[in-house]
Curated annotation (Swiss-Prot):
Name of this chain's protein: Putative adenylate kinase
LID, as annotated region: 103-113
Regions that span the bilayer: none
Species whose genome carries this gene: Sulfurisphaera tokodaii (strain DSM 16993 / JCM 10545 / NBRC 100140 / 7) (Sulfolobus tokodaii)
Record-stated family: Belongs to the adenylate kinase family. AK6 subfamily.
């Protein structure tokens, strides 16, 4: 059985994967660190402070690792996994997520892009497009153990941050941050 746990950075994926894999007795795979260890990247993006994944190599490595295993996979790249029995998308209130990423010391552009992705449901949309049936869980203000129980009971949420006016305002300010970086790059 393959269970994918995905969501924007800061949504709690690693913690949930650790708890869920232990509870089920499954192996776990933290995709980003696995790909870095196996040098499945093409370059390092200084501006975004992250590796650019070599998707073909990554897909092959992951497919080989998960073959014939019961595994819980933590990833922000759901399309790198060939198949899954269950896909869980962790969603977190963008205002809370913004604070969490800032606390981690992330750069302004990286925070803006990731919080905007959460508001717009980018990872959720990608997972839905790739796998069809997904389960979104709003993890905001929930203990990790509560989230694991919600996953096991298949109790999904319907998350739409764009219905909240304050979040619409946040989206506009994030867009300005991203645009200012894009403008500075095009000026070079």
């Amino acid at each position: 059985m393959i269970i994918i746990i995905t969501g924007t950075p800061g949504s709690g994926k690693s913690t949930i994967v650790d708890l869920l894999s232990k509870k089920l007795g499954f192996e776990k795979l933290h995709v980003s660190s696995f790909l870095i260890q196996n040098k499945a990247f093409s370059e390092y993006d200084e501006l975004r402070q992250s590796y650019v994944i070599d998707e073909e190599k990554a897909f092959q490595l992951i497919d080989s690792f998960i073959k014939d295993k019961n595994v819980v996979i933590e990833t922000i790249y759901p399309s790198l996994i060939s198949h899954a029995d269950k896909v869980i998308v962790l969603r977190k209130d963008p205002r809370v997520l913004y604070t969490e990423l800032k606390r981690r010391g992330w750069g302004e552009l990286k925070i803006a892009e990731n919080v905007m992705a959460e508001i717009l449901g980018v990872i959720s949309g990608e997972a839905k497009e790739y796998f069809g049936n997904i389960c979104e869980i709003n993890v905001t203000n929930k203990k990790p153990e509560e989230v694991v129980e919600q996953i096991l009971s298949n109790n999904c949420d319907n998350v739409d941050w764009l219905n909240i006016e304050e979040i619409q305002d946040l989206l506009i300010s994030l867009d300005k941050v991203i645009s200012s970086y894009e403008d500075s790059i095009s000026d070079e």
